[in-house]
Amino acid sequence: VEGREADVILEIPRDFAKSLGTGRPVELQISANSINGTKGGLGSSYLSTVVNDFVNQELGGTGMARLSVLNLYNPHLNYKVFMVPALLIMMLTLLCGFLPALNIVSEKEVGTIEQLNVTPLNKFVFILAKLVPYWIVGLVVLSIGLVLSAVLYGIVPSGSLWLIYFFSCIYILTMSGFGLIISNYSATMQQAMFVMFFFLMVFILMSGLFTPVRSMPDWAQWIAAFNPLTYFIQVMRMIFLKGCGLTDLWLQFGKMLCFMSVFAGVAVWSYRKTNA
């Protein structure tokens, strides 16, 4: 379960058969990954039913086998613990996706982009200057969200708070870079809004925010594999609920870093200082 190779397991003691033969009661334990409280609760419930049916059939329900359930990472199956970190991410996604997408295209509409284009300002510096404000705003909004989640719901990260900010910095720059790419290619604010809205809906619905990725059809899992939101949700839930450190998140870190580099690089490359 800790290695994410199984969601529900049944732990049987070594001396199970010997204990039954000597008439001693045995303890069986079901361990369930309850990060998703609904999924963990259903899985442990189904397995408990199977085990109890077996005990009643083979042992006649004599009380020789006692079954206990251990809900890992979310002992009370609290759905808020599962959803609040994801909602913080969705808030960051909408904020740091929509606003950058409207940035450059709004300057195209009012004509101020022409004044910037005639300056000797480097493209990299220009895009960086566009990214930094949303990076700061995103971190401020994240901080407010973390405070509210602690005050209103009593939900605090089990892992490092600084690690959350570290991954948030990467994700904010990723989504802001993607928004600037759309802004570079859009002619009007309405066009940028509709295009960004389409991509954000795909990102949110195909990220595991509401439905576990492994329960999706193959084509949806393929889309989720190329979705930066998928990996940030995994990171937030692993830090919030499992208390994971950076050594447990190397895979997500590498993929998020790739997304950030690609989107930021394309944002710089796609910006043109001429209208040709």
Report residues per predicted region:
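Extracytoplasmic loops/domains of multi-pass membrane proteins
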Residues: 1-56
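Transmembrane helix boundary and interhelical loop/hinge segments in multi-pass membrane proteins
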Residues: 4, 97-119, 131, 276
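A cross-kingdom feature of multi-pass membrane systems that activates on extracytoplasmic/periplasmic
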Residues: 56-77
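Membrane-interfacial helix-loop-helix junctions in multi-pass membrane proteins
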Residues: 73-77, 156, 208-262
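Long, hydrophobic alpha-helical segments
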Residues: 83-102
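Short helix-capping/hinge motifs at transmembrane helix termini and TM-loop junctions
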Residues: 101, 105-106, 152-157, 186-187, ...
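Alpha-helical transmembrane segments and their short interhelical loops
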Residues: 123, 127-197, 201-204, 246-253, ...
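Short cytosolic juxtamembrane segments of multi-pass membrane proteins
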Residues: 269-276
